[in-house]
């Protein structure tokens, strides 16, 4: 796929499969190189390199069942040369971990794609759940 928007559409479809526990479609969109990265709540610190990213994607996808990534809202995009970064809000609903009921949640996500020959490949994803502000949390001024 050489059209960036087409690749992003495939990426969103792959995330829908991810929400059902199948990480393979997302893995297929990644560049399988030593410089790729992934940061998500299941792996703690960001991981670097294809082998570790693939393992982290397997771990993360194994935590989801019976889910959907129902909506993505693009907040911003930055495209230049052979790199493109999108910032999105993703609306998910899934059974997570041992939970027996599917719950909705919102992720804030930054994804970077790189043009590899004539195809765009993912090289970075950082996803965090958005939670309610905690006035007593560690990042609040006193």
Model features per residue range: what roles?
Residues 1-5, 139-142:
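Basic/polar N-terminal segments that are highly enriched at the extreme N-terminus
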Residues 88-95:
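Generic short beta-strand segments
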Residues 4-5, 17, 23-79, 89, ...:
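A solvent-exposed, acidic/Ser-Thr-rich amphipathic alpha-helical stretch
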Residues 75, 92, 108-112:
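Hydrophobic alpha-helical segments of small multi-pass membrane proteins
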Residues 12-16:
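Amphipathic alpha-helical repeat scaffolds
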Residues 85, 105-136:
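Short beta-strand edge/turn micro-motifs at domain boundaries
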Residues 21-23, 110, 141-142:
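A generic "structured core" feature
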């Amino acid at each position: 796929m050489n059209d960036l928007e087409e690749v992003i559409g495939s990426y969103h479809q792959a995330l829908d499969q991810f929400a059902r526990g199948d990480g393979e479609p997302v893995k297929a969109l990644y560049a399988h190189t030593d410089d790729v990265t992934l940061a998500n709540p299941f792996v703690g610190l960001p991981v670097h390199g294809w082998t570790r990213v693939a393992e982290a994607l397997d771990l993360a996808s194994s935590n989801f069942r019976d889910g959907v990534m129902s909506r993505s809202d693009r907040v911003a995009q930055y495209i230049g040369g052979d790199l493109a970064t999108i910032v999105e809000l993703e609306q998910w609903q899934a059974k997570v971990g041992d939970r027996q009921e599917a719950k909705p949640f919102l992720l804030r996500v930054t994804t970077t794609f790189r043009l590899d020959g004539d195809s765009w490949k993912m090289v970075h994803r950082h996803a965090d759940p958005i939670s309610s502000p905690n006035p007593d949390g560690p990042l609040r001024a006193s």
